[in-house]
């Protein structure tokens, strides 16, 4: 009974944290859009929407990818946020209403410079669709843009790759990616009548290591978008 009460208390704590982060994520997204910056909330709040209970995922900081140049993002951040010294290759760190925020110049990096360049090219090619993919947060907390299913299945795998080599992988990342793959399979494959709209894998190879390789099933009605492998 004591353990059950501890778990119930922890669940309520996580719920309150999610309510706070959702409100701030919506505020941040609206602020950036009103200031003329196209953006997309990565991982956290979008991933939570795939959970059976969207308040059950332990939230972290808010990662927002801003579709603008590094110089423009830096100039904007200096005007609108308090910045510390932690400015990295792919993001800078700040906070909004007490919630840690990472403003991303690009979503993720790779250690190999050739693969990194290909990945950034792919990010730029798909940026517009991600910043246009608007969803509603639970209980009317507001709207945010999140990545499509087909973008997530590639992006979050590279994020796991980065964690594996540089930071370590936690259970949250593993569960997140399981739900990402599950969401991708439902939105991109199971919603299609493959007998009428076959996906020809021989014409659309998936490997990321070959220049020009693509895999592009037609978008589903849920807005999952296309899948084009980095090349």
Regions found by a protein language model. Name each.
Residues 1-60, 65-194, 198, 205, ...:
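Conserved NTP-donor binding/palm subdomain of two-metal-ion nucleotidyltransferases/polymerases, i.e.
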Residues 53, 220-221:
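N-terminal low-complexity, intrinsically disordered patches enriched in charged
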Residues 206, 217-220:
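Ser/Thr/Pro/Gly-rich low-complexity, intrinsically disordered segments
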Residues 211-212, 222-225:
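Glycine-biased, low-complexity coil/linker segments
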Residues 214, 228-229:
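Ala/Thr-enriched low-complexity intrinsically disordered regions
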